[in-house]
Amino acid sequence: MLPKSLIRLLIANAVSGVSQGIMMVAVPWYFSNHLKKSEWFGVIYAGATLATLFWSLYAGTLIDKHSRKKIFLWINASGFFFQGFLALAGSIYGDMPWMAASAFVYTMFTFNIHFPSLYAFAQEVSAKQDYARVNSWLEITHQSMSVVSGGIAAILIGGITRGSLLFEVFGVEIVPRPLHEIIALDALTYLLAWMIVQTIEYVPEQERLAEKGSVLERFKQGVRFLLENPGVRTFGWASYVIFILLLIEVHQLLPVYVDRHLQSNGNVYALSEMIYAVGALAAGLWMRKTLKFFHPVKTIMVMMIFTAFLFAGCFVMKSEWYILLFSVLIGVTNAGTRILRVTWLFEHVPNRVIGRVNSVFNAFNILSRTLLGLIFSLKFFNSGGNIRYAYLICGVILLIASVVLLVNMKKIQATTEKA
């Protein structure tokens, strides 16, 4: 049984996560399909990603220094007021690019402290022997909400028209909803999540010492830990690549691929997001029972290689069915990799430095996504069906990261348990 405090936090996370997921689908589609300015979104995404570098470094030290409950209260309170303001502005003046960009960027900044705090809290309130089970449940609940948000997003941004697959399922016509209404829904769920977090009471499994020193000094402690533990460093960076590419694919490449290469509507885009979550959910349920039978590093390497070939398939194929198949399979590989990766790091990184170590890895994530985001925002990739070349590049990068894991396998396996 999961700790009651963690169950309540997961419920709060699920409430706000549904509308966040809807919005993270709606905003990229707004730029690609409604404004026909996918390159604008590419630049916004790259710029926002770079800006989160400094925030994520600071966020990691906050996670290690302050009560994780207080952090979640702050996240949800600020989300309610900020997104509520944007929704109000949209209802008065109509949907505007700056409003869409602000909502998306704010959510990106929120994610950079929300998910590290969630994993740190889970580690803090869980016994060591329960790490794998807890991580599986984190993945299951997160992806369950992604399934729900993807399905709702398909209806909200694409509507339901006569003759469509969704019309056959639901039997009603629904017009697409304006973006400011989606943002308003997001604001309200932040408020509900804040109310749930208020009820959380917990006793940590591990005692944390009060942290001292500046943000830079505490960040250096995370760097120092990785320098002293080369196996953790190499594994953490190389295994992160699959998540970096997934974020780029979901937020920047997929809407352009569906709109320009497949020439399909918003339903296909949103359903791709939903079916990805179905695959991730299946992986979470499957690995919860079978995790002990897997060798973490070798399994991650195999899944990364498999995902590389899936990306290459997007370069070759021009099929709505393939992009749906691609989405469900990368859902499996991404979620499976995340469960194995987080569990491995829980076992090798002490809780007192987990936030700072994750901040260092996140800095690598952010710089990589900024570079790739700028490259893929070039006019070439956003013209006609050229976005498929971006998928080919992603496949090559994944293969290179897999080779890094293979070459350093002995060093990673020799890592002594620190936690």
Q: Residue spans of the language-model regions?
A:
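A single, central transmembrane helix in multi-pass transporters
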Residues: S164-V169, L179-H180, R218, R224-G284
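Cytoplasmic helix-loop-helix junction between adjacent transmembrane helices
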Residues: A103-S144
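Intracellular juxtamembrane helix-capping segments at the cytosolic ends
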Residues: V27, I113-S126, G336-V349
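Juxtamembrane intracellular "pre-TM" segments in multi-pass secondary transporters
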Residues: M1-L6, Y202-W237
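Short hydrophobic/alpha-helical segments at membrane-entry points of transmembrane helices
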Residues: R8-L9, D95-A103, F235, W321-S327
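C-terminal transmembrane bundle of multi-pass solute transporters/carriers
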Residues: G42-A48, L53-K65, K69-F81, F85, ...
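Helix-loop junctions on the cytosolic side of multi-pass membrane transporters
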Residues: A120, E124, V175-L179, I183-G213, ...
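Transmembrane alpha-helix termini and helix-breaking/packing motifs in multi-pass membrane transporters
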Residues: W29-N33, A87-I92, V148-I183, R260-H261, ...
